[in-house]
Amino acid sequence: MRKLRITICCILAFSIVEAQNGFSIIGVDKEVNPYQYTVQKRGEFKQAAVSSAHPLASMVGAVVMKKGGNAFDAAIATQLVLAVVYPNAGNIGGGGFLLGRKVNGDLIGIDYREAAPEKANRDMYLDKNGNPQMNLSLAGHLASGIPGTVAGLFATMPYAKLSFENLIQPAIDIASKGYVLTEKEAGSLNSVRESITKNSTQPTALVRATKWKVGDTLVQKELAATLTLIQKEGARGFYDGKTAELIVAEMQRGGGIISLADLKNYTAKLRNPISFNYRGHEIISFAPPSSGGILIAQMMKMVEKYPMSKYGFQSTKSVQLMIEAERRAYADRAEFMGDPDFFKVPVKTLMSDAYLTQRMSDYNPDKAGVSATVKAGIIKESEETTHLSIVDPAGNMVSVTTTLNNSYGNRTVVGGAGFMLNNEMDDFSVKPGVPNMYGAIGGEANSIQPGKRMLSSMTPTLVLKDKKPYITIGTPGGTTIPTSVYQALINVIDFNM
């Protein structure tokens, strides 16, 4: 088997061993020690690898595969641990997208993006004069969409091999036993303590009387209890019963609008992934309500006919060409992309060779364009996010991007449940033409409607070369996610990096 080259932080690889003694893997004398660990930023491995934003999450994912799990098992366990050790983006109170490819070639797309509550309306963040009140969609209870992560984890289970009870146990153990904070983690928690205190109505383990410092142990008993309830009752342990009641009680204390019915009615959805070819590579990414797949397809296909490798890495010609493709793709994003269950997204047209040739027809290599003058094409009728990449020994590939939107979401911890809520409502077009927190401008396609999923920039992506696993990639970064993935793929494929 060819070696797996991975350059995203926090990786671990291994030889496969048989499962022994269940999943008691957390402790000073166990496979994963939450009180002493190191970060590994890059490496080459023969068997398999897990890449995530935190070493403990990656280590757990690796041990899961050692004990007989596949890439999907590892993805579930890794996400759950991130919900404990990476509270600024790992979550059970947010949402995301999972893109997978089974060894037999089957593609899997699981959409567990947050959705607007039933009481949401398109003008909910406007004042009486029709002006946006952006603070309402950024922090506090009204900023939250219906969480989708837990539903997404259970939607992944049909592709896994191990029991959910085992896969969630490491996260429960780390939450209840605690983990040691690094200097960066302590500083991150301290930087948001005032905001969390302001927006949460109950005490939380993330905020204490004195500031956090390196070497402190963060124990989250309430979060452990919430995870244990999910372990015992499945998705119902989150969307119905005690946890759901705690979420709604928190909403009511802070003026939020998520209801018990919103939670009970939420479902993850299967989506057909987007696939296209670029210089002999098959690239697979996510479809709407993620804009990422269409965007990287547009941008890469717009530059494909140009000799990028001849231009050279970071040359004036290559940089200008890539930027002009980005301008055109993002103009289309604002006009044509939204939740496909509410708005007909012209996916085939947006990715067609004829349309993209027309989009680049006014490209002038001797003159830079101006973003303000770039409009959407004409189509005829007919710190804040986290990513994990996993490849297992059999060749299954999983790419997952999940988020609370802003770092630490809406800065509200659910009282009695111990987890942070998202502020994904800001990803809707609060008002057509008005940018969100990342500067993205949207139109009617992404307006607020009850039950609708807000347009996302998350871009979990897989690449095959000679029909074999080659790259699994994704990144945080808001609306810069698609351009980051696009540039990274160009760097690897065109510039042999």
Predicted regions and their residues:
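Short glycine-rich loop/turn motifs
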Residues: 46-48, 95-97, 271-273, 296, ...
